[in-house]
A protein has these predicted regions:
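N-terminal alpha/beta PP-like core and its mobile active-site loop of ThDP/TPP-dependent enzymes
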Residues: 2-218
Length: 218
């Protein structure tokens, strides 16, 4: 068991444990997560998004979002989230905007690194211009600077994709895994703002996605 009361060691068992106890919010409200735990960044983000009421993920996965996709697979198998596969990022982003706009269901768009993210970003203009809050979560180049990661922006500068998303609207790059709290706070402020909502772009470098984070889940 992990150091928190009753929290299993593996991701699969943790997801089932959350489900058997009524879900993530029920576990937190019952005070069962009072101690520190060490989890991968993508799992922490999924749990944080669930806490914000986001359980629907519209996705086109690739090498830039493999780790995030695997975490979603595990939590979907446990019945805690629902994933929807698409073939076109523009269509996917429009569907997410409509889901929030028409049915008031918060959701997240997930893409890989590069061209797909650019297409989703182009379609985000609809949610931005109409004040519709949607998470846009994109895979991003590693923070190691080891050379081009396939399909990243081909320019010899640091954090190019983060510059693009920052130009488009509210944006955050999780260069440091421990910054997840700030990222989720800023995301919630943008996505759930009562009068100035819009898309929130969260860039996830390939190497930080599996990185361990020590935290209290309550």
């Amino acid at each position: 068991m992990n150091s928190s009361q009753g929290l299993p060691e593996t991701q699969e068992k943790r997801a089932k444990w959350f489900k058997s106890h009524g879900g993530v919010n029920a576990v937190v409200e019952a005070g069962l997560l009072s101690n520190t735990v060490s989890l991968g960044l993508t799992e922490v983000l999924v749990l944080g998004l669930i806490r914000q009421g986001i359980t629907k993920f519209l996705m086109i996965l690739g090498h830039g979002s493999t780790e995030f996709g695997e975490t979603l697979r595990v939590y979907e198998s446990a019945g805690l989230v629902k994933g929807f596969q698409f073939r076109n990022e523009v269509e996917m982003a429009h569907a997410a905007t409509a889901l929030r706009w028409v049915y008031d269901e918060p959701c997240a768009v997930i893409t890989s690194i590069g061209p797909g993210a650019l297409q989703a970003m182009a379609a985000s203009i609809v949610s931005s211009s109409n004040g519709i809050g949607v998470y846009h979560i994109y895979g991003d180049e590693t923070t190691h600077g080891e050379g081009y990661n396939m399909q990243q922006v081909p320019k010899r500068e640091q954090g190019i994709f983060g510059q693009i998303t920052a130009t488009m609207g509210s944006s955050y790059t999780l260069h440091t895994p421990q910054a997840f709290r700030d990222a989720l706070r800023r995301g919630a402020t943008r996505v759930f703002h009562p009068s100035k909502a819009g898309p929130f772009f969260l860039n996830l470098p390939i190497n930080t996605q599996p990185a361990k984070v020590t935290l209290r889940l309550d």
